[in-house]
Structure formats: structure tokens, C-alpha cells
């Protein structure tokens, strides 16, 4: 107020005589004279304003030199002299206006939920590190970089992304660092023959190629197409098939994805509001000469001087010369423009006189007065502005300035106040609002996934992946749901916001759902579909779907909701682009904007700001307007190549851009502060801000009871409306009908729709059906509410209820082009025409009892209708001679009724009342009718019918579909007049019918006991009114009512996914699917047992042989193991055997018909055997071999007398058959493209049929040969003698494989084995000279030549991930047999218990230890918890204990064999223990350790007396086995690629075999060492003494793991625990010199005693229910300690163990496996036996020491085993200690450095990890390559190449080597080291990158790798 009245004071300005340069000014008495400005301007202010603390002069001269006023005690004295309330000090506001009240303030005590800014402000703690500068000094955003989790990758900028996004081909880091230094990309796998490969590698079905839909997501499936689906009127078709607005043609913008809309353009068609660039592009006219290069060629900025004056800002004045100056300089007496236009009379400048001065009436100024160059200049205080009179001031309305406040603004005189909506809070700047709640997240669709990004951090997370083509999305924050549309799948889906629980919401009736919006208040889902031109609504689960808006919609795109106001907003970029709105019930529709729009894409609502924002991809602009469309303004009009979607949050806009593949942001008011949030995205689509304030709470108008509505409750303004799903009539204001009574039914290729006649809106509704590809024909049956349709893409006939439920395929085989369909509602029959097979067929309405009615003289039959009253059916024929025919519904009385003036007769319809037949002719462009006999023909409609297709009648109307007008029309059925269009703009219209419930009833004899027919009863025009018919391929018997039981003579063939038959009993060829209810994936070979009527087939994908009856029943698998690629199969119906070839295993096998007694017949010198045939009477089998040297061979049916018949001029001999009548062999060769014939000895060879394109299966019956052909996809027939008369039996059969011809009437031959199986106990097999007895694989035949042993005696047992197999060593074939143990996933280790006959195994996928009998039965889990990676397993067959290593937990454990009494034996100083072995007789436990320092250790069976045996020159000690006879250990080293051995003390070490590829496990039997090898995928063996005679036992086996020998010689011997468990209550552990009792780690229900014999033996039902081993007839030696003992490390205390020794695991610690002490109360016999045993052991020990001492004197100094012996030797009572000699580094390739240096261990962990991955995940790596890879950390693999000289010296000093040995070893050492450069192989020089492997990653099978 002071400034207001002070401005009214009078003042006088007295200037000195002279110019302003005198710098002297004088004001009146009542005024203060301000300092003269640099321009000589003088200013006078009222005197009372001097020294008042305000800078009134503007230069502080009125406040200079002032004596500060005295403030009251309650006030604060500012530095500028101003007095303010003391309570305002340090409150965060600048009240002094010089900030002195906020200086030197103590830190404000912020609340607990606040963050203290460095400037003293307090903000919410949630705002700290959220990316917003809330403090104003950015102190709240000075944050430490977030740590990435183990499953994340850190980008170079510090942000975190999902680990699997690293090097995935997509740039996920903002700086692109995730795609740097990546290995070469792996090319996408090729698609199969029935798929199309998109540009970016994705495979889609080939039928989607060039179908007009963007199925790939990048339109690559629609490029280079010869034809496309037509575009709508007003649209231009791009070369790719995309349809765009026709007005965009030649407008300078490339709107087509291939830029074809801008090709061959002469002139651009720019509008009057556009400027045409030199390039032809059209831009806004207002952009002309605006200083921005909008044309991209700068042509819009050229010649601008003649285009008119530039535009000045609103606060500027435009001078005549074009210059812009500030408005305040207007009429100030100064020539600021330069042309004096700012001071001209035209500007109404008041004349200035010398008398005017600020001292007189304040110069006439209302507030401030200044003298500038001798003239008065009025100014105003802050918050005011000068009016046009230049004197008075008026209040500035800051609230009118856009963006001054973020949300709300209240203006007052000279001031204003900002405020925020509920849910927001003012920031410290007092102008901007911040949303309360969590940090905002941008949720966006990226086409193939949906991701989240933090807008201020650019951190990136994946929500959903593996999507097809996600476009639109929205979320429901309260329900934590995300919704999205997929325009490739044409689906709307939803999931939880954590990415779980993905489910379909809307799956039918969608074509291009480009917009999606969630009503979070009323729980509704709205979407737009530019393909159907609709806006629809449904519940959140998709229920009660309703078409809301459909009229005057062209291409609705984006949609946004305002549930609080009950309004929908949407964009439409059709021919008339616009933005519209309506109530959420569809009422009150209105236009928001319809000018200056081209391609309005994204749309969003700022709920707090009450505005809408949208992007226009054509105009390259972001605009905004009020919600009613007013105050429209462009926010951003530059730098927007192709904006797609937009969202808003707080004061920022975020949008996606297709061209830049980025997410961008800018200020929503000004468009400034543009920033790229994310770039290099895959294809950014829709975007939303995920935050609760984007979905503010609102009133639910429908309440808790859905508004009382039965179906939909939709908000309408502030009220609501009850609505019904589309097509359902409304009964009253709240209720809808529950069903439909009548509706128009029509097909549209990809869907089937209905238009309800129960309502007036006539909008069509999609019946929710799945997998509709190309629907053509329709019909219906109102009795069960079924709708039937044919699909010419899937070649099926299906049905469902009219609401889409109960969908079922009723006919799915032997269809090629089912074009017509008719339902006989009287007899419940289904009739159809097939234009591909030229047939008319019939079946029951469920598809059963199908038969062919008419197959002759048909040429592309099309539509069909039936008239059950008269017993006739009618059909149109589209062929060379178009016609309309009729016949009885049983195919009798066939006649042509219309044959002239027809071109393309399409739809048919019968008017049952007037007995008329109607048809539509697309060629004649007419609809006609005639009598049912063809008489009285008349044209009903003969004009304006471009292409009628479907036709139907209802009531007085006729309805038809038209392909060209894309519409459904109707007219009067009698006159053809009163035409109207029901629906238009419907692509791909097909058949049409009216569903109603008034079909006339008809009586028929078929209604009574099926007319007496055994199968089909059909209506007939005959006097009886019906006739009986049989299913396809079956003959009707003479009684005319009964059908024969089945086919007698037929072809049966495999078609990969099914088995089919073609009857040869009838005069036509029709294939019938054998209805086998089993999964088939790749059925190849086939055979038939005519005796039992069963078919046998092999499946090379499922790896099994199965069988079933010919009617599909009694199906079962007979062989399920040991099969790889079974290409050939033959059934010996006489001998009751099945034979097969296996290309994968290169074997020929035989078994009984039930798969039992399986035997390998031929296994040597086979190379891809394929077809096989039998000649039982001759005892021969014949087969083709497809290998490198193709051939035809023969042998006896027992595998004997093998002979090569033909081995020249063969390529790919596929099919094979024997003609017994002519004694000839016939075969088909796909490479030579011939079918050839020879006699049974291979002579007289000649060509029978040539050329044939790609024959596969071949068979023979009577006078004909039949074969399948891959190229023609057909079955062919020819004369077997001449090869002539080749005909097509069946065509259009993709996936054809084997074929057999069967005549069940032919008698079987004589069985050579007779009725008693030839006296054989197992197999009796024919041979040319009779027969032979044989045994199943691996079992020996006894000397009598008839009887087989019950099982093999000695055999190998090995694991191969998903299987356990056996190889008998009793027989010579060495073929593997699967042990049928169920539920195997990833078997690693195994062992066998010969007492119970059980195999024990570990499964690291399930983390269990299990056991089972060898026949696969009695499988049970022994250990089912607490395991991580059990790599080693061993059975103590004497004490009945089980031992295992756990690499994941670094433990060795034991339990009873049933898993009880579990106990950890060793759990320290272990680093990845692997293999384990036990020696019960010695009481020893051995294991390998794969860790940082590899070693092999030994302990007692209780874990005590632990000792390192080998710790030098080891890489990856994998397998371990014991030779109990020679008392030696053998192990394989997968890194050093060798097999070694040593004695039980680790001495006398010897390399047995070098240069093995990658051995994993090994075992020993007799003189052989057997091992498995990962790289060679084989089992091999070598002589254990010499290392020679290396042989491959089994080859080509994936995933080989453990291997053991089962033999009576392996598990022998005993110990004290072998009798009654040693008297122990729980665990009994034998040791080297005694035994101990132990208790489990977790007590059980039985008391545990450490004293043997104290507890009575447990009953057999307890955990000790284990059998004792069968012991030899010798007394066991048992030795017990009489006192409790504690084991410690050698030489006394543990403290004397060095740190280095501890690292090497050389110290036995006192806390390791402290054994329990035996008790005192032992039986006397035990004591006596113990004393005798002590004496015996002492004698043996002494003898052994003497022997070794003498032996060392005579040992050959050159023996290699001494080279690797331990460096020190001690007595048996002492622990061996090995000094830690430094290992040499491979890097500098030095053998030995005297000075030593730090110890170097193997840098092999990374390669080990890779092997670990192979162990758990099923990888099979090329290990030669793996070893060459470099470490990601720069380390090189170091190999222990040379022995250390110190090691030799230590051996010598310890006495283990004499002088000769020492000298010899030193010489060898120097020799080895000098040759290290040549001896070192390249694969020793690298290591692998760290894979980050964890044990938990396990896969169930190799197929998952």
C-alpha cells in the first residue's frame, strides 16, 4: 500500500541548464534524486522511500550511506535495513530480499522423514536420489552409484541392466557398452519348410507370408509380394502392402515403410496451409521463414526478405525496418529502432515538453517515475505492469502465464500463489509440484518385450519378454496389472506388474488393436481397433465385451480415459483425421479437434493440469489443448521425426519415436529442456508413466453392486448406464437377455461373426474361436446351438457353440479345400464338398463314420445345401463346365439341373416354403432362382453385384456377401428390391447364414433304431426314404444294412504326425487316419501284423517304437530306450518278431512283438542302415545302407551269413521290398531318382521306373508297386513288372514316410521255429538253413545251444545324463542296453551293491541320491534333501554304508544304504571334491579334489587319519578307481589328458596313458582299464599293465558320465563291520587297524551308542535293515581299541602345521572326523582275536618294510613312476608332508628358477567351471578349443610341465632315492626342461573367461543345452 499512495505524491525535477552529460540532476524537496545513470538519465523518487530498505532507484543509491533504522525487539534487522519478524529468520524464505535472513543459519532440524539439503531446505526423504533437483542446489541428487545385483550387468555409465541382455544384439545400456567387445553373432537358425523367416530372424508360418498382415513386426513378411489384400477407398497401398492415407501420396514425407508413396512423383500435393519444399515435401506454412530448416534443404528459409515482416515476441515491438525492440522502449523519446518508428506519431506517443518532470505530479506516473534523456518514463513495481497510457500500472496476472505454476495458481493484487492438486506437493521453489508416492517409472512396449526405465537414471529393467509384437499398453496400479495388445497375435493380454501370470484377455475379433486404456475406477478395459474401425469395452478379464462406437470411425488409434469425468478421448487417422471424445458409455460423442491433423498417434491426459497432449507423426509436432479442445497450442514442432506415443508426469512430457528408436522428454509447457531418456531401442511403441498419481482416486459411479446391472455398468458423465454385450437385447434398464434367438452368421477368413437380429444397432460381434485361419463355408444346428465351419488353410471342419464354447475339430484329415458345408438337421449328418479332392462326403455331426458319397465327374465343387424333406442335396460346380447338380442325400439319382449361363456359381440357398433354389454367380454378377428341379429359372438381381459369394434366406429377405464391395447386403427375396447394406468395409467376406430356431421338423425312418443300419443311415428320395452306407474303405454286406468289420486289402503309411490307411477294396482312393490317441512327432518306419491286426511304427523324435490296433485302440510303447533314429522296421508275422534298423546307433536289432528279449543282430560295419524287409520262408533279411558307400545287404534273420548284394551305382537307397512271387528285390533310390529291381542275389539288376522325384517308402501288393514321394507329397502306383501305368493314388500329403501294403486274406507262411519256439529258452530266429536260438543282448547262450543265462555275470554300468546303461563283458558285441530306471534327469555318479542287486546314482538336476533294481523297479530316493552337487558316490558293500562327495557344499558324507544315519565325515580343507572310492577290506576312503590345488587324498572310512597322496602335477583329477588285486589307485586327469596310477600310499606313480581327449570317469576289471571320454563321446579301454592295446568299446554316446564294473570279483573281502554291523547301533566304520561306531548328525528315534554291542541289534524294520554281504569262508579279522582315542595331526600339535601345508591340505586337524571310541564291554573272542591280529600286522609290516628297503636298491633308475613319487618317506605311523615347491608359469615357459618366488597354482578354475557347466547343464564342448581361450582377466593357463630340481633333491635327502636314481632324475629333469618350448602344446596356453557358473544351474536333458 505504501508504494501505491507514495506514487501519487507530487514531485518536481529541476535539471541544470545544459545536457545530460553535465551529470547533474536536481529533484524537488519532497523527492530524492537518484544517481545519474551512464546514459545521463535522472530518476526522482519520493523522499520517504530513501533508506527504507527497498532498492527504489534501481541502483541502490537511495539506500547508500543510510543509517540503519532501529528495529523493534520482536523484529530482525536485515542487512539492507529492512525489519522483518524474527520468526521469519531461517525459515527457508528470502523475506529480507537480500537473503540476509537466511544466512549463517544453523542446520535446520529436518523431520525423520525428511532429507536435509545443503542449502538448508528440508525435502521428503523419498525425493532423495529420485533424479529430480528438489533441493534447488542438486544436493539431493549427489548419490552413490547403485550396486548391480549378481544377475545384472553394469553399464559404463553405472546403470544396471539384466545380465542376459549383455551381447544379445540389442543396445540396452544408454551408452551402448553392453554390446561392446562381444563375440561374433550367431546366425539365426533357419526356419523349416513350412515357415517364413522374417528379416530379423523370427520364424512365422508360411501362410502368413504376403497375407497383408504385419506378422513379422517389421513388415518383412509383406515385402516382395506379388499381391496384397486391397486397401480401403481413400488409401494408398505401399509396395510392401501397407495401406496409408491417399492424401499422403507424393507429399514429400515417406509414410510407407519402403518410401514407395514418394516414388514417381511429379509435384507434391500440398494444401493451401502448407509450403512446398524444393524436395517436394510439404511443411506448415507458418514454418516458412521462421529461422528453422524444416524442409531439410533450407528451402523454407530462402528469400525471406520478401515474404513479409518477421514475427516479434509478444513483449516486443516490430520496427518498420524489421527490427524487434522491447515494448518499454516504445515512446521513450529515444530512437531505439533506428528508423524512429518507435517514436513516430503513429505510435500515439505523447508530445514531450520541457515542463514535464517527475517533480510535478510524479510526472503523471502512478508508481515510479524516471527522467530519461530529459523525458519522463513511468515504471511499475514488481507484480505490476505499465498500461497502454504509459502512466498507470495494473496488476500482472501471473496465473495467466502458462507454466508459471505447475498446476493451480491464485492471483492477488501484486502477487500470486501456486498450489497443487491432491497427491502432489509444492517443491521448495514454491512453483512446481512433485507427486507423492514412489519414484516414477516409464513403462513402454518395445515390440518384442515390455520394459521399465527410470526417467532420471536411465536404468532399465525387463518386465515381459519373448513377445510377438506388443504395441499398445496400459496398467492398473491398484490391481498391479499391466495390459498390452499384440498386433501380430491379434490379442490383448495382461500380466501382473512383476511379469508373472500372463493370460489372454481378448483373443478373437481383433485386427489391429492399436490403442488401449484402463478405467482404474470402474475396472473396465477400452481399446481401439483400426482394422475393424471400432472402439470396444469389456471387463478387465475380457468378459461382457461390447462394441461401444463403430459408426463414422475409420482408423481409431490412441485412446485415453478420464474416469473422474466419465469421458473417453481418442484419435482417428483415417481420411478425416480428428480427435474425438464421448462419455464412457459411448453417448455424447463430440469432436475435439479436426483441423491441422494428419496422423494423430499418441494421446495422453494431464489430469492435474486438465489438458490433453497428442503427437502427430505426419506433422512432426506435439500439441496440447484443454479437454474441450480449446486453447490448442503446439508445444514442440521441431526435431520430431516420427513420434508415436506420449505420456506426461509432473512438468515433463515423455514420448517414443520410431525413427530415432528412442524415448525423449521435454518440459510440457515450453517444449524446452529436451532430453533423450533411452535410445537404440528395438522398436519403442506405447509408453505410460507408472505411478499412482497417474491413476488418481475417483468416485465409482457403479458402486459395489455394479450399479445393479446384470452385465456392464459404464460411467456416463456423473451417472452411469447399464449396457449389454454386443448383440444381446436389453430386457429392462438393468438386465440383459442371456442368449440369442436369431442372428446373421458370416465368415471373414480369420474369424466368424454374428449380427444379432435381437437388437437394432446391427453391429457385428466376433464369436470367440481359436485358430481360425481361412474360414469359408458355414452352417448351424439350433438344437444344440452349434455353428459349423470349414477352414481351407488348416483343411479342417470344426464346430462350437454360438458363444464360442465347446470348440472342437470334427474332421481334420484328408481334406484339401473344403468349400461347402450343409447340416442335415433331421438325421444329424454333416455334408461337405472338397474342391481339392473333387469329392462330396458325409459323416455324423461329430465327424464319425465318414464316407465318400460322390467322387466321379466333379470339377471343383463349391457350395452345398440339403433338403431333408425331399431327400435331396444340391451343389454348385465351379470347374471347366460350371453347373448346378442335385442327387439323393445318399448319392442316388444324380442329375444336372442348371448347366447354361453359369460362370462362377457360388452360394446356394433353398426356400423350403416356395420350393425354390437360389444361387449367386460371381461371373455373371447375378442372383437367380429356379424350381428345385431347375425349371422356371429367373434373375432376381442383375445389376450392381460386383462379386457375390455367400447367400442365405430368412423371412422375406435374401442376404449375400460381396467380395468387391466388402459388404453384406440384403433385398426382398421375391422382387430383389428394397436393397440395403448391413455392414461395409469388411475384408475377406465368405459364407453367410441366418441362425434361427424355426427349421421345419421332418419324420424319417432313420429316427427309429438308425433305420436298422449298422453304421450310416442317410435320407434318400427312394420310396423307403433312406439307405444304409458304410464308412470309407469298408464294404456293405449283401443284406444292405451291415458293414464289414474292416479293410481287408489296404495301404498303410506314416506321415510324421499320424498313420493313415487307403483301402484297396473300393473303387476310389481315400485315405483314413488311424485314430491312435498317442503323440506322434516324427513317425518314420511302419509295419503291420496282419494276424492280430496291429500296426507298428517308429518315432525318431520321441525315440520309441509303438504299436496299436488298426482301429486305433490298444496303443502302447514297446521300445522306449536305446533308440536314436529308427529308419527301418519290419514285422515277422510268422515268427512273431519285430526287426528294426537304427541309423543313429548303426545297429540292426530284433525283439519279440511286445519289445521283450531285445537283441542286437548286426553292429559292425554298418553306416546308416535304413529300410529293412524280411523273407521268413527263406530265412533272410535285407536292408539298405545309406552311408558313405551305399549298399544293399542280406543276412540270415539271426544276423548270420551276411552278404553285400549291391554296392555300386547307389546314392540314397530308401525304400526296399521283396516280391516273393517273382523272387525279386525292389528298391527306390532318391538320389538316382529310380526304382530298380534285381533278383534275390543282387543279379539281373535293371531300372523299373524312372524318373521319380524323391521316392522314400516302397511296397508291393499283387500286380502293383506303391511308393511315397517327398517332392510330390504323394503316393504313386505302377505296374510291378513293367513300371508302366503310373498313377497318382493320393496327393497333398506332406511329411510322407514309410508305406506298407497289406492283404489280410493272404495266408501266412510256415514258422520255422514251430509251435514250441524251436526249444529255445528265449529267441528263436530263422536262418536259411533252419533256425538258431539266441539270447537277449549281453547274455550268453549256454552250452546246450538252447538255454540262456539269466543275466550277464560281468558288465559295465555307466551313466549318460538321462540314462543308465549296461554293456556286457560276457559277449563280444559290447552293445549297450538301457537299464529301465524311470525319472532320470542328469545322472552323474553311480555305484552298485552286489548284495541287494541295486544300482545307486546321483541326479544333480533333482539334487537327490536314488537307488533301483537293475530291471528298473523299486526306484526310491535315498537322500532327498541337503544336497547341491553330488559328483561322487561309493557303496561300502561290507558295512552297508553309502559315501558321497558334494562339490557344492564341499563335504564328504556317509549314511546307511537306505539313507538313514546321515553323517558329515569331512567338511574342511575340501575344494570341489569329485570322485570317491572305498576299500572296505583295508578300511580306506579315497577321493579326488578338483579345487584350487588339485589333489588326491585318503582317509579311513570314518574320515580319520586323512592323508594327501598326490598333490603335484595334477590338473583336473576326475575319475578314480581302485584295483583291489594289485592294491593300486587309478585316476584320469581331464586337463593333463592322461590316465595315471599309484599305490595306495600315493607312491610308485605311473602314467598309464597319455593324450586322452577328455576323460571323465574310469573303472577296472581284470587286465583292463575302462574310461568315459567327453570329447570322443566314447567308452574306451586299455591294458592296465602296459597302457597299450587301446580299444573303443562304445562310440557316439552323448553325455557320458560315470562308469563302474559289476563283477563277482569286484565286491569281495570283509571287515569287522560286516557282521551284525560290528555291534554298532547306527554307523559302523572300518579303519585301517580297527573300526569305530558313530552316530548320525541328526538323532533318530533310536538311542545311539558309541560302544559296540551295548545296544541290541536293531530289528529288520529299522534303518539298519541291510543285508550282510556274502563273505568268503574265512574268519573276519576284527580289531577294536579298548579306549577312546583322539586323532591329531602328525608330530603332535596342530600348531606345528605351516600355513602352506594347511593350504595344501597336508595337515590332519584334531577336529576332523573325530571317531567315536569303542566301548569296554567287548566279547572275549574279540579281545583274543584282536591280540592275534596285532601280532600278525606287526609281522607283515616289518616284512613289508624290509622288502621295500631291498627293492629300492635294485629299482631301475629310469622308472617313470619314481619321477612322480612323494618327496619324503616316513613310517606308516606318520603323515606324509610334501614341501610346497613353486610351480612354473607357462607364460614365460621356464622349467625352473632357482630363486623361486611366490607359489603359482594352476589357473584352471575357469575351465573347470566350464566343465562344471557341462556336468550340470548338459553341454558338450570342444575341449581342444576351450583350452585355447584367453582369460577375461588376462591370466594364462599355467601347466606343471617340468619337475622341480628341489623335489628330486628332497627325495634324495629323505632316503627314498639313492645316488644313481638322483643323478638319473636330474638328467631327465634338465632334458625335459630344455625341450619345454617344443613339448608345450598350444592348448596349454590359455584359459577360459569366468562364466559365473553356479551349481544350481542344471538342465534336465541334452536337448535343453
Curated annotation (Swiss-Prot):
Domain LDL-receptor class A span(s) in chain numbering: 26-67, 70-106, 109-144, 147-183, 190-226, 230-266, 269-305, 311-350
Keywords: Calcium, Cell membrane, Developmental protein, Differentiation, Disulfide bond, EGF-like domain, Endocytosis, Glycoprotein, Membrane, Receptor, Repeat, Signal, Transmembrane, Transmembrane helix, Wnt signaling pathway
Residues bearing glycans: 264, 498, 719, 901, 1077, 1415, 1467
Disulfide links within the chain: 27-44, 34-57, 51-66, 71-83, 78-96, 90-105, 110-122, 117-135, 129-143, 148-160, 155-173, 167-182, 191-203, 198-216, 210-225, 231-243, 238-256, 250-265, 270-282, 277-295, 289-304, 312-324, 319-337, 331-349, 358-369, 365-378, 380-393, 399-409, 405-418, 420-433, 702-713, 709-722, 724-736
PTM per Swiss-Prot/TrEMBL: N-glycosylation is required for cell surface location.
Transmembrane segments: 1724-1746
Domain EGF-like: 354-394, 395-434, 698-737
Pfam families from the UniProt entry: cEGF (PF12662), FXa_inhibition (PF14670), Ldl_recept_a (PF00057), Ldl_recept_b (PF00058)
Region of interest (Disordered), residue spans: 1659-1696, 1853-1905
Keyword Transmembrane among record annotations: yes
Residues in the signal sequence: 1-20
Cytoplasmic side: 1747-1905
Biased composition (Polar residues): 1872-1881
Comp. bias intervals (Low complexity): 1671-1690
Top-rank taxon: Eukaryota
LDL-receptor class B repeats: 480-522, 523-565, 566-609, 610-652, 653-693, 785-827, 828-870, 871-914, 915-956, 957-998, 1093-1135, 1136-1178, 1179-1222, 1223-1263, 1264-1306, 1397-1439, 1440-1482, 1483-1526, 1527-1568, 1569-1610
Tissues where the protein occurs: Expressed in different regions of the brain, mainly in the olfactory bulb, at lower level in the cerebral cortex and hippocampus.
Subunit structure: Homooligomer. Interacts with MUSK; the heterodimer forms an AGRIN receptor complex that binds AGRIN resulting in activation of MUSK. Interacts (via the extracellular domain) with SOST; the interaction facilitates the inhibition of Wnt signaling. Interacts with MESD; the interaction promotes glycosylation of LRP4 and its cell-surface expression.
Family, as annotated: Belongs to the LDLR family.
Family annotation (PANTHER family): LOW-DENSITY LIPOPROTEIN RECEPTOR-RELATED (PTHR22722:SF15), LOW-DENSITY LIPOPROTEIN RECEPTOR-RELATED PROTEIN 2-RELATED (PTHR22722)
Role summary: Mediates SOST-dependent inhibition of bone formation. Functions as a specific facilitator of SOST-mediated inhibition of Wnt signaling. Plays a key role in the formation and the maintenance of the neuromuscular junction (NMJ), the synapse between motor neuron and skeletal muscle. Directly binds AGRIN and recruits it to the MUSK signaling complex. Mediates the AGRIN-induced phosphorylation of MUSK, the kinase of the complex.
Protein's name in the database: Low-density lipoprotein receptor-related protein 4
Organism encoding this protein: Rattus norvegicus
Protein encoded by which gene: Lrp4
